[in-house]
Amino acid sequence: MYEILKVLNHNTILVLKENEEIIVMSKGIGFGKKQGENVDVPRNAKQYKMQKSYQAKQKSNNIFDYIDPMYIEISSEIITLTKERFGKVEHDILLSLADHIYFAVKRIKEKDFPSNPFNMDIQLMFPDEYSVALKAKDIIEKYTHEEINADEIAFITLHIHSAISVNKVGQSMEVMRVIREFFKKLQADLNIRIDANSLSYIRLMNHIKFLLLRLNNNEELQMDITEFTKEKFPFAYEQARVLCEQLSHVLHKDLPDSELGYLALHLERILSCTIIS
């Protein structure tokens, strides 16, 4: 038996079991129920354990004061899509995603449309997560009758990525910022224009995506071409070293030397097919 802490709506309740707070979602589970009552939870009910840290718990409880439970249902459907696409979801994003969608819809109603400067890079680095976010767009529209734009889809992509990796949304945004500012400076210094849709650029973004996975799994590339690229492509090597230092700073991890060599090779390919402005 679970003790009801709060009835959010007919289909969603917050319960306590063995000193653990859990959001339970099942059709009609909250109908006619009151705080303090005990309730049986169906075996097929969706359950989301609340974060245990004090700060996270306080934020979670505050969310219930202002957010329509409908947004928790939206978030739950998106998590289901994520599980279907990627398997197990490593981190619970139920409330953080619901909170983001709530404010996204609020901004739409207020005609406030913040831009996402990392939209294209997010699509290139996380195409699978982005495909789930596109489906999430339809779920949001089904519930709210509001259509989110491409920039918001990219933001939701980062939430989905954080659910299947150890990278939090803020950290992923920092990685995107570092990459964007690095190429902005490189283009200005060399008076060139880099095509973000080129195959070479897409390959670089894909390499960085798997670089992050290798870091998270404490894995290293088997072949080290660092000395080769240092001798063959000294300028690209030096630029790759700068990028590695910047990424290490935001990730709080040192990048192996083997990553430097491959980043240099990708940068050389990009630079070899750039257009002088």
Language model regions located:
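A cross-family "folded-core" feature that marks the main globular domain of proteins
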Residues: 1-277
